[in-house]
């Protein structure tokens, strides 16, 4: 049988999602725990591989097993065997044609900035700290030119291995909640470092270092060297993955869970 899981993790101490030799990864920890509960070796597939230091509240994975367990037994057993910074949020048996990556229709990320004179001691690894004055409204305005199906060459990592730079961004909102600035973005898929590169460029607009029109000029230039710096990994969260409605996968609050979903720009769209 095939089982899908919703996963949350703090990526601070991991060298990314993907299993690697001699360094810790989220995938390796999950496969180790799953293999223990299933009592056989388990290999997993995910909806989106996150980089070192990047977090998730809405990662989705699937695996195949012949072990018979209730959904609650999988959840409780896994959470008892996983490290404290990885947790299972839901479990559901799915059809064998389901694939965590290829069945997905969209991904959604949030980038959380703590905009304050002083760095935070609590949540320090879960936000990106900027002490400069930042205008979130200008960032939001500048980002609207990124909506639609477009060539995002200017915002892809130099080493990105995707065959095409074209992506379809269906939602982009930047809002402020007290000292927190949240960039909320959804697309059919993302290029390597795309969200962090967009964030880094929008921050230059928010700080008054570049005009609002600059983002549209960057998009048209198709040149990564002209864009802003890559924003730090610690503020980025994979918060949701969309699937066809007929799959009836659980829908939970997007997170990060300490961020009020009632805040402007962070509710469901």
UniProtKB/Swiss-Prot annotation:
Record EC number: 5.4.99.12
Top-rank taxon, per record: Bacteria
Keywords: Isomerase, tRNA processing
List of catalytic residues: 51
Biological process according to GO: tRNA pseudouridine synthesis
InterPro entries for the chain: PsdUridine_synth_cat_dom_sf, PsdUridine_synth_TruA, PsdUridine_synth_TruA_a/b_dom, PsdUridine_synth_TruA_C, TruA/RsuA/RluB/E/F_N
Gene3D superfamilies: Pseudouridine synthase I, catalytic domain, C-terminal subdomain, Pseudouridine synthase I, catalytic domain, N-terminal subdomain
Signal peptide residues on this chain, from the entry's feature table: none
Reaction catalysis annotation: uridine(38/39/40) in tRNA = pseudouridine(38/39/40) in tRNA
SUPFAM superfamilies assigned to the protein according to its UniProt record, in alphabetical order: Pseudouridine synthase (SSF55120)
Residues at which substrate binds: 109
GO molecular function, one term: tRNA pseudouridine(38-40) synthase activity
Pfam family, one: PseudoU_synth_1
Similarity comment: family membership: Belongs to the tRNA pseudouridine synthase TruA family.
Cited function: Formation of pseudouridine at positions 38, 39 and 40 in the anticodon stem and loop of transfer RNAs.
Quaternary context: Homodimer.
Name the UniProt record assigns to this protein: tRNA pseudouridine synthase A
Gene: truA
């Amino acid at each position: 049988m095939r089982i899908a899981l919703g996963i949350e993790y703090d990526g601070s101490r991991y060298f990314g999602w993907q299993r690697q030799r001699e360094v810790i990864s989220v995938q390796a920890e999950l496969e180790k725990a799953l293999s223990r509960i299933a009592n056989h070796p388990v290999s997993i597939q995910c909806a989106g591989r996150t980089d070192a230091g990047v977090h998730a509240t809405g990662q989705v994975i699937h695996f195949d097993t012949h072990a018979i367990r209730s959904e609650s037994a999988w959840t409780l057993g896994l959470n008892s065997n996983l490290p404290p910074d990885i947790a299972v949020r839901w479990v559901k048996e799915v059809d064998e044609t389901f694939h965590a990556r290829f069945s997905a229709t969209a991904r959604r990320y949030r980038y959380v900035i703590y905009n304050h004179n002083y760095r935070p001691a609590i949540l320090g690894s879960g936000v990106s700290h900027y002490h400069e004055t930042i205008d979130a409204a200008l960032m939001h305005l500048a980002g609207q030119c990124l909506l639609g199906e477009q060539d995002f060459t200017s915002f892809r990592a130099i080493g990105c291995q995707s065959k095409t730079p074209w992506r379809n961004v269906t939602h982009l909102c930047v809002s402020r909640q007290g000292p927190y600035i949240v960039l909320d973005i959804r697309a059919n898929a993302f290029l390597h470092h795309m969200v962090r590169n967009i964030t880094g460029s929008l921050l230059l607009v928010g700080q008054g270092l570049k005009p609002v029109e600059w983002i549209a000029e960057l998009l048209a230039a198709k040149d990564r060297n002209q864009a802003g710096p890559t924003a730090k990994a610690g503020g980025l969260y994979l918060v949701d993955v969309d699937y066809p409605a007929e799959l009836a996968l659980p829908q939970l609050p997007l997170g990060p869970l300490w961020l009020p979903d009632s805040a402007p720009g962070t509710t469901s769209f």
